[in-house]
Amino acid sequence: MALIPGELFAEKTLYINREKLRRYAEASGDHNPIHLDENFAKSVGLPNVIAHGMFTMALAGEAIRFWVGDEWQIVDFSTRFTKPVVVPADEEVGITFSGKISEVSETNIFIELSATSAGVKVLGQTKARLIF
């Protein structure tokens, strides 16, 4: 793949469900009930259980890896969480990532990306710097 500034990547959709949230909670130690307990999430004004922000960001990293391959290493990564990813019971929820190469140097590439779920922007101003 030629790495050209301005090049757009094909959209990549990754899917999550309640079981993946449970497994992420176990691995991360983040057992906040807004991510696991529908009644609790609704009691604090959320529409339903929501995905962990860092899990959503990790999936953005997976999309980057899909686009550029394993030769490149992410060394800087930042995002703004614009809206939560809502995960209803018994549903697979898609998160669609889109991105572009913003800059290329001899040893670095810079990628900008965003993510939507159910038509709502969930990540914004997401930037990554990768080295070869």
Residue ranges and their predicted role:
Residues 13-15, 80, 129-131:
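Generic structural detector for well-ordered beta-strands
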Residues 1-51:
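Catalytic strand-loop segment that frames the active site of acyl-thioester-processing enzymes
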Residues 50-56, 117-121:
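Noncatalytic linker/hinge segments flanking ATPase motor cores
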Residues 47, 56-98:
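Hydrophobic beta-strand-centered segment that forms part of the acyl-chain substrate-binding groove
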Residues 1-9, 89-132:
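HotDog/MaoC-like acyl-thioester-processing domains
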Residues 28-29, 41, 75-77, 128-129:
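Short, charged/polar low-complexity linear motifs in solvent-exposed/disordered segments
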Residues 11, 74-76, 125:
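Hydrophobic residues on conserved beta-strands that form the core of alpha/beta folds
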